[in-house]
Each structure stands twice: as C-alpha cells, then as structure tokens.
Amino acid sequence: MKANKYLIFILGALGGLLYGYDNGVISGALLFIHKDIPLNSTTEGIVVSSMLIGAIVGAGSSGPLADKLGRRRLVMLIAIVFIIGALILAASTNLALLIIGRLIIGLAVGGSMSTVPVYLSEMAPTEYRGSLGSLNQLMITIGILAAYLVNYAFADIEGWRWMLGLAVVPSVILLVGIYFMPESPRWLLENRNEEAARQVMKITYDDSEIDKELKEMKEINAISESTWTVIKSPWLGRILIVGCIFAIFQQFIGINAVIFYSSSIFAKAGLGEAASILGSVGIGTINVLVTIVAIFVVDKIDRKKLLVGGNIGMIASLLIMAILIWTIGIASSAWIIIVCLSLFIVFFGISWGPVLWVMLPELFPMRARGAATGISALVLNIGTLIVSLFFPILSDALSTEWVFLIFAFIGVLAMIFVIKFLPETRGRSLEEIEYELRERTGARTE
C-alpha cells in the first residue's frame, strides 16, 4: 500500500480515540465529581451506564444511516455529537445534566463503534486489512491512555470538568479531518458510482489490484437483494447471531470492568486518589503498547489462534488474581492486583481487543455490512452496560474475587465459541469471505 496514505486510516480511526477517551475518563472523574454533585453507589452506576444506554441507541441507528448516508458523512455527524456531549458534561451543575451529557456522548460512541470499523475495513487492501482495521482498537487504547493522563494531570485541582470537557479537542480534529477524507469505495460502488470508487482505490490500493477488486465487488453487488432482504434472510441471521455472540463475549470477559473501575479497584486496594489514577495510567500505557504489537501480528497469525491464545492468558490472569485476593486480601495485594490487571490487558490487547473490530465487518455482506455491524455493536453495548452496571454491585455482594472467577468461567465459554463457530478470515478479500459464508449457510450466490 502507498505509505503516504496511512493518514486516511489514522484520521478515520479517530472515532475510536474518542470512544476510548470517554470510556476511560469517567474512572478518574468519578473520584471528584461527588465533591460538587452528590453521588451514591446507585447514581454513580447510573452516570457510568447512561453513556452505554446512549451507545445502544447510537449503534442501533447508525448501521442503517451508514448504509444510507455513507460512512464518511456519518462519521462527521458523530464528531458533532461528541462535541455537544463533551460541552454539556463540562458545564454540568447537577446529576441530570451529567446523565444527559453522558447519554449524548453515548450516541456518538455507539455510532463510532459500528461505523469506524466498517469504514476502515472497506478502505483497506486485503493484505493490510487486519493491521489497518486494528488501528481502530489502537486509537481506542490511545484514547483510554489519554483519559488517564488527563485525569492524573488534573487530579491535584480536582478538575473533573476539564477531564470530561477536553474530549472536544479530538472531536474537532475528527470533524475537520474526515471532511477531507474519501468515501468508502465499496459504498460508492454499491451506490452506482464506479468511477468515484476507482479513484478512491487508486489512493489505497496498488494499481495492479484495482481491476480484480472491482470485479469481485461488482459480482457480489450483482446478487439482487436489498439491504433489509439480506438482513432478514436465514443465512445472514445465522451469521448475525454469531457476530452478536462474538461481540457480547468480548464484554463479558470483563474488559470494561477493568477500564471503567480501574481507579476504584486500586483505591479499594489501599492506594490514594492520585496513586490510583497513576496505576490506571500504567494500565493504559500497557494497553497501547500491546495493541501496537497486535497491528504487526494480526495479518501474520490466524485470527482464531490469536483469540484462543488471548483467552488462555486472560483466564489465567483472572484466576491468579482471584486466588491471591482470596488468600491475601484485597487491601494487602495492591501491587499483585496491578500486575494481574496488566497481564489481563496484555492478553486482551493482543487478541480480543483488535480482532473483534477486524472480524465483525469481515463477517457481514456488503449490502448489510453497516446495519449488521451496527446490530452487533448494539449488542456489545448492552453487554458493556450489564458489566458496568452490575460489576460494582456484584463486587460488593459477592466480593471482587468471585466476580473475577465469573469472568474467567465466561472466558472458557468464549474460547469454546471461537473454536466451534467463528470462520477464519485472514488473507481473504471481503468478497471471498462473503462467498464462503453464503455457501456454508446454503444461500444462493448466482
């Protein structure tokens, strides 16, 4: 691929950075919000989970919008929504405004989760699709780390408004940057604009590959089914179920319990407020570094092998952490918790973190890719909502180690699911994957 065109993918993936920032920033901001706006454990859970309720709506609506408006224009709209939500949060003076701001941010987060991976996948040449698709996850981890660093920087002045409001900066960069980016060539071809699709492909593809790729795209488009006909068809229904289960397993393994409540977990272990936030910075740094490694291996190692290997590592980390907390006690095991959470992040960041966002768009056909990815993202957000809402409740009711054991058991189920139900997609064009899945499920391809 032409090296100077990576800017397209970096700017396209900025939506992932905003998703990560708004996921990560709340863990530090919660330590100080309650000093200005009274919060108890219930209202704290509502503030955290309200973003996820918005994300469910955003993910569910953005899929059809991405297919109708185009990937690029929808990302521009998402950036505007991010800006509005961040400004409301920064200006919040009561619980209601906090919840409204988080709901609006959630709309943008849900839209970003379903639209950005599709845009990156459809723009990328086959041999680089895994690496470039992983840019979305890398940006998510950079956003989380940026949130932790901002939290630490403003901890001394208890500046939670700055923590929440600074999301405006990358939102404006995304809005301006995506304005100058091209539309997905597959969306252009789907909307009968072959010449524009060819011009875009000249930017990201080698010239020798363009005719072959366009031929495959047109053959798939020749299957005369509308978006909703494809979505309602039995063959896609089976694939959509696989995609949704894949998405919800990523959350039920417990990653966002770590992201949302990392500062609170460290505080419970006996660290001070600033030290708890600094511990989260370390977690975020590891997340970024291991995702960079994933970018270089995701197109060299089969996707399923990465997922299974990551599962084994995450399960081991959770089990060790649970046993040590059980035997030593959470107040006496702060550094053990940091080490175990770090290992958990390493194994997640090399596997389920990037691979989910690479594979989801790969599983679905062109005519329904935006809508089907949106539905999967909606289900993922429901899973995130359940985890974030019930983790502190279960942690108090059952103790933290039992919650980690539950996550480990779910990790075993996730590994079985990957082995039995997920197809391998590495090294194959999106059109080749669609042909195979149609044949495996008995759908016509003529």
UniProtKB/Swiss-Prot annotation:
GO CC annotations on file: plasma membrane
PROSITE patterns: MFS, SUGAR_TRANSPORT_1, SUGAR_TRANSPORT_2
Result for mutant: N256A: Loss of transport activity
InterPro entries: MFS_dom, MFS_sugar_transport-like, MFS_trans_sf, Myo-inositol_Transporter, Sugar/inositol_transpt, Sugar_transporter_CS, XylE-like
Record text on activity regulation: Inhibited by carbonyl cyanide m-chlorophenylhydrazone (CCCP) and by the human glucose transport inhibitors cytochalasin B, phloretin, and forskolin.
Ranges of the Cytoplasmic topological domain: 1-6, 65-70, 123-129, 181-234, 296-303, 364-370, 421-446
A GO term for molecular function: symporter activity
Result when mutating W357A: Loss of transport activity
Function: Transporter highly specific for glucose uptake.
Outcome following mutation: I105S: Affects symport activity. May function as an uniporter
Record-annotated membrane-spanning stretches: 7-31, 39-64, 71-90, 95-122, 130-152, 155-180, 235-269, 273-295, 304-324, 330-363, 371-399, 402-420
Protein name, as recorded: Glucose transporter GlcP
Site entry: Important for symport activity: D22, I105
Pfam families per UniProt: Sugar_tr (PF00083)
Lineage: Bacteria, Bacillati, Bacillota, Bacilli, Bacillales
Extracellular topological domain residue ranges: 32-38, 91-94, 153-154, 270-272, 325-329, 400-401
Impact after mutating Q250A: Loss of transport activity
Family to which the UniProt record says this protein belongs: Belongs to the major facilitator superfamily. Sugar transporter (TC 2.A.1.1) family.
Domain of life: Bacteria
Keywords for this protein: Cell membrane, Membrane, Sugar transport, Symport, Transmembrane, Transmembrane helix, Transport
Compartment annotation: Cell membrane
Membrane topology: Multi-pass membrane protein
